[in-house]
Amino acid sequence: MSAETATSPAPAAETPVAPAPATQTTPAEGAPTPAAAAPGGNTVSASLYVGELDPSVTEAMLFEIFNMIGPVASIRVCRDAVTRRSLGYAYVNYLNAADGERALEHLNYSLIKGQSCRIMWSQRDPALRKTGQGNIFIKNLDQSIDNKALHDTFAAFGDILSCKVGTDENGKSRGFAFVHYSTGEAADAAIKAVNGMLLNDKKVYVGHHVGKKERLSKVEELRAQFTNVYIKNVDLEVTDAEFEDLVKPFGPTISVALSRDEKGVSKGFGFVNYENHESARKAVDELNEKEVNGKKLYAGRAQTKSEREAELKKSHEEKRLENEAKSAGVNLYVKNLDDEWDDDRLRAEFEAFGTITSSKVMRDDSGVSRGFGFVCYSSPDEATKAVSEMNGKMIGTKPLYVALAQRKDVRRQALESQIAQRAQQRMQYGAGFPGMQGYMGQPMYGYPPMPGYGQPMPGMPPVRGPMMGYPGAPQNMMQSRPRFNPNGQPLPGGVPAYGMPPQVPYPGAPGYPVRPGGARIPAAPNANGPRNGGPSPVGAPQGLPAGSIPRGGQMPARPHEQAAPAPQAGRLDAQSLARAAPAEQKQMLGEALYPLIHETQPELAGKITGMLLEMDNAELLHLVESQPALQEKVDEALRVLAEWGKDEKPAADEGAEEPKKEEEETKEEEKKE
């Protein structure tokens, strides 16, 4: 392998820079983050796991760092399958294991975009990763101890495969850590030497790591043999002596405490610790729901705060899932309601389709209707019938939009999935040229191009020069699609694509020279025309002399021909939309929405229009008529685009260099010719 190949920058995708040897072990695509690379693998591996990465780190950034150690075979940043966001870890494959060892020695805990990375050998075998051999657990750590300080402290006892300090979402230490040694003997030596020592003036606990399943089973055993009892709803007039007399008949106690505040007033609850589990169980059975001084007591096993919070969270989640299961398929979302609609009017319009359990029109803080509401039926069949009958129905001045209600996070996830699918389609069919926005460099509304998209029609000359009125514009820029009547005159609706200037008429149109057989007549040589096969002047299609084109790049108008009017916003109504063919309705809605969106988002108008056209036609018509509703949808689309673009922008910029390079090579070839 040449040195030039080894030092070339890595592409954004997982394209190997050089072929890897047969002995190399590469991590599986989308493999989960290993807790630690377990020892015992016999295969010589040159694959490193790099964790704790900033979400914006790309393959190219990692290549620049790791290629300084030695030739890199491939790099992959693992990403979410739907959103394509970085999962915070990557795999770096070297051509030989010696380079991997040097990278592990010199780059471990180094800063990448201001964040310390964690490097260890990749272990593909999950059985070896999860054995836990040589893995120790440390708790009661000082907040100032990080991964590097932990590694330096425990490296004296043996070869460390991985060490990690547990952190919260803000990156602060949670006071515990894990260290994984290559051998069990090293782990035993570390436990013997460090357990009970002071680290930064705090006494730490060090022991063998116990798996979560084993810990939970042990906790359940301890809970089943509880001796500490919690009693609440105790009358505030009950004294300590009366409380002891209440709990002592069930067995010998270790401690009895009735909680009081700083003023000595009872808080209404207390704790009793019995000597054995049988006494505690008997106290719970006898005292729970027993009436004392007119109050029913609650008695149960004493729980820690974290345990109570976990149970409370679990109960809330179960209740939420139960409510969702009850409303699945029966709860409808109704939009485009007139301002005067109330709950009774909403129920009256929908009660013909079945039994309504609840109906509500949503209002703001001042009591003004927000234009939407919810209707819940007793069965899914009734809800389905209401959707089929009421969706798109004109009641008052607006067509209703009726659909099954969805939670906000579900709608957001569906929208992100649509954006990810469009991104994959652009990658599959070829993205637009750099700098082109919306429709200029993409097929209509973000859909994949049809076969032959961007190619000339049969009998049409290939366009080598830029389009008229757009010097230097790319050749695949979307052209207008005017509609013609049988006499060949353009209809009023046949406007160019969203404000683009009229294009040169197709070959074969009146005034275009053709042979009797229908073929185009080649143009005669012209002194002002291109020479030696060079490109035509700006705005001149091949086959026409440049002198026949007036200044400004405009074709002369034919007799009785009138220019097509510019698209006007807000001219579309429900009646005209209903008269149009289904295939043309989306086009009409797009032509009406684009200028409205272009007023506030000129650069992203094309993308946002394509996103909104996924919606129902009735809802799109409402967006055309209601500027506040349209602005709300535009803002939502901008938020989704901003979040999705955080991870995709660096990769897109790198991928955009290839079309630029090809364009430069094409220009060089034309100069040589």
From Swiss-Prot:
Residues 569-646 form the PABC domain. It is found in: Cytoplasm; Nucleus. The keyword Transport applies. GO terms for molecular function: mRNA 3'-UTR binding; poly(A) binding; poly(U) RNA binding. Keywords: Cytoplasm, mRNA processing, mRNA transport, Nucleus, Repeat, RNA-binding, Translation regulation, Transport. GO terms for biological process: mRNA processing; mRNA transport; regulation of translation. It comes from the Eukaryota. The keyword RNA-binding applies. GO terms for cellular component: cytoplasmic stress granule; cytosol; nucleus; ribonucleoprotein complex. Residues 304-322 have a biased composition (Basic and acidic residues). InterPro entries: Nucleotide-bd_a/b_plait_sf, PABP-dom, PABP_1234, PABP_HYD_C, PABP_RRM1, RBD_domain_sf, RRM2_I_PABPs, RRM_dom. Residues 1-39, 300-322, 509-572, 644-673 are annotated as: Disordered. Pfam families: MLLE, RRM_1. Residues 46-124, 134-211, 227-304, 330-407 form the RRM domain. Binds the poly(A) tail of mRNA. Appears to be an important mediator of the multiple roles of the poly(A) tail in mRNA biogenesis, stability and translation. In the nucleus, involved in both mRNA cleavage and polyadenylation. Is also required for efficient mRNA export to the cytoplasm. Acts in concert with a poly(A)-specific nuclease (PAN) to affect poly(A) tail shortening, which may occur concomitantly with either nucleocytoplasmic mRNA transport or translational initiation. Belongs to the polyadenylate-binding protein type-1 family. NCBIfam families: PABP-1234. PANTHER family: RNA BINDING PROTEIN. This is Polyadenylate-binding protein, cytoplasmic and nuclear. It comes from Cryptococcus neoformans var. neoformans serotype D (strain JEC21 / ATCC MYA-565). The gene is PAB1.
